[in-house]
């Protein structure tokens, strides 16, 4: 009797498959991506490698040593203090505590601050509060700290916003009116996002994370691209990450273009050049999980799409890997076996430059991803590599080589806690444990500026405030 391996369905349910069935599912998932995106198939060796990863006996697996990548985040501290019946675990804690827990306890390479409503439009009335929270976090933290939220263009339609819902207009065959409504909403999205980030950047934010770009279709992406363009023009040194909502841009409008390219119907490898053109530093491509398909089918499909996106992108790609995307099951408590296998496959086969950790409970998301493929932040040198990706648009190999040269170590040492623990204390660039007298917060970041030859926004703010 053939050996069966414990795997998952796209909804997280455990199933058992033989090796032959795993290969069959991998090839079918890959073929689906190839057909839809008109991209090359994975090679036979890559399919075999995927099967090998899926059949590994351990519950948790990880990348080969030396292949670790930085992680970025969606939803910020909401996975800790959120309590809405989804993936938040409802721990009463401040956002400062939540951010520092990710930095000090989880070994995150970067982190983000976000509002409980997690969209840019609701931030407007409370932006002063967000600015104060950002300032306090930046004074205490060392890893790059973004402000993150969703463009969420749906909030600009009735009953939540000023413009009539284009879905209702289209049902009434008022097509021109629907187009006008989407275009007006996109303009407001651009305006509001830029305004919010002007305030947050003035309060020391390292940058901005656009989470779930194009959730409301091509007009949502249109508004976001123009927001990125405006922010890049005004703030040349702002870190900008643009993550997508889905694998294909829905053509709700159908006629909108950016840089002469129609946005409707774009797949990840076609989205990447436009995100870079607008001025983002890092692109977060997405592949949606099909809950009625197996994990091999979903993972091969996701890896194939992401490999094509990485090859088409001139900027680093941090693949979105929350629940329901990137080959990960759609479950609030994502199974650790599925998460770590998907994380390893994305790094070793798709060649991604980083992982954007998305929705899911703390153990199933940040802890699992960081254990599987992360650089462990300040425990080693993950925060430094991430800074170079965002400061200079460096892909993972170049960023690691740059940092290793500055530290006078080998690239493999960048994720070695033993090497980096002593080196970080010697250079006074911040250590993860509480050492009396060691540089912390702004002081440590000022030393990082000198080491890496970069400018850090919170340090610039501090310098302006001193007399």
Curated annotation (Swiss-Prot):
Pathway listed: One-carbon metabolism; methanogenesis from dimethylamine
Domain of life: Archaea
Alphabetized UniProt keyword annotations: Methanogenesis, Methyltransferase, Pyrrolysine, Transferase
One GO BP annotation of this record: methylation
EC number: 2.1.1.249
Catalytic reactions on record: Co(I)-[dimethylamine-specific corrinoid protein] + dimethylamine + H(+) = methyl-Co(III)-[dimethylamine-specific corrinoid protein] + methylamine
Protein name: Dimethylamine methyltransferase MtbB3
Gene: mtbB3
């Amino acid at each position: 009797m053939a050996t069966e391996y414990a795997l998952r369905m796209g909804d997280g349910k455990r199933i058992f498959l033989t090796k032959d069935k795993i290969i069959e599912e991998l090839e079918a998932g890959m073929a689906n991506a190839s057909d839809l995106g008109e991209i090359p198939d994975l090679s036979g060796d890559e399919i075999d490698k995927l099967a090998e990863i899926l059949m590994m006996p351990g519950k948790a697996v990880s990348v080969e040593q030396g292949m670790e990548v930085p992680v970025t985040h969606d939803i910020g501290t909401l996975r800790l203090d959120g309590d809405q019946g989804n993936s938040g675990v409802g721990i009463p804690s401040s956002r400062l505590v939540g951010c520092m827990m990710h930095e000090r306890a989880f070994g995150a390479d970067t982190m983000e601050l976000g509002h409980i409503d997690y969209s840019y439009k609701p931030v407007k009335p409370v932006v002063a509060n967000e600015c104060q929270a950002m300032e306090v976090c930046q004074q205490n933290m060392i890893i790059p700290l973004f402000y993150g939220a969703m463009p969420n263009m749906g909030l600009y339609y009735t009953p939540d916003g000023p413009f009539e819902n284009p879905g209702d207009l289209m049902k009434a065959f008022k097509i021109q009116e629907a187009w006008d409504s989407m275009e007006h909403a996109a303009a407001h999205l651009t305006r509001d996002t830029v305004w919010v980030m002007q305030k947050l950047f003035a309060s020391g934010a390292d940058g901005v994370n656009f989470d779930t770009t194009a959730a409301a279709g091509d007009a949502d992406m249109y508004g976001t691209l123009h927001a990125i363009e405006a922010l890049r023009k005004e703030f040349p040194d702002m870190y900008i990450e643009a993550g997508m909502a889905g694998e294909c841009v829905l053509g709700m409008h159908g006629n909108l273009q950016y840089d002469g390219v129609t946005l409707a119907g774009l797949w990840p490898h076609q989205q990447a050049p436009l995100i870079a053109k607008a001025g983002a530093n890092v692109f977060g491509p997405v592949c949606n999980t099909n809950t009625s398909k197996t994990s091999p089918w979903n993972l091969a499909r996701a890896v194939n799409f992401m490999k094509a996106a990485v090859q088409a992108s001139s900027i680093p790609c941090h693949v979105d890997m929350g629940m329901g995307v990137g080959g990960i099951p759609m479950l609030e408590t994502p199974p650790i076996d599925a998460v770590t296998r998907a994380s390893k496959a994305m790094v070793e086969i798709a060649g991604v430059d980083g992982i954007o950790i998305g929705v899911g409970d703390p153990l199933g998301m940040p802890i699992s991803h960081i254990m599987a493929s992360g650089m462990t932040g300040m425990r080693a040198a993950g925060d430094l590599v991430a800074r170079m990706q965002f400061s200079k648009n460096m892909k993972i190999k170049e960023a690691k080589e740059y940092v290793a040269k500055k530290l006078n170590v080998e690239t493999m040492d960048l994720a070695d806690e033993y090497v980096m623990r002593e080196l970080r204390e010697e250079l006074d660039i911040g250590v993860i444990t509480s050492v009396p007298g060691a540089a912390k917060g702004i002081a440590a970041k000022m030393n990082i500026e000198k080491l890496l030859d970069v400018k850090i926004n919170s340090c610039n703010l501090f310098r302006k405030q001193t007399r």
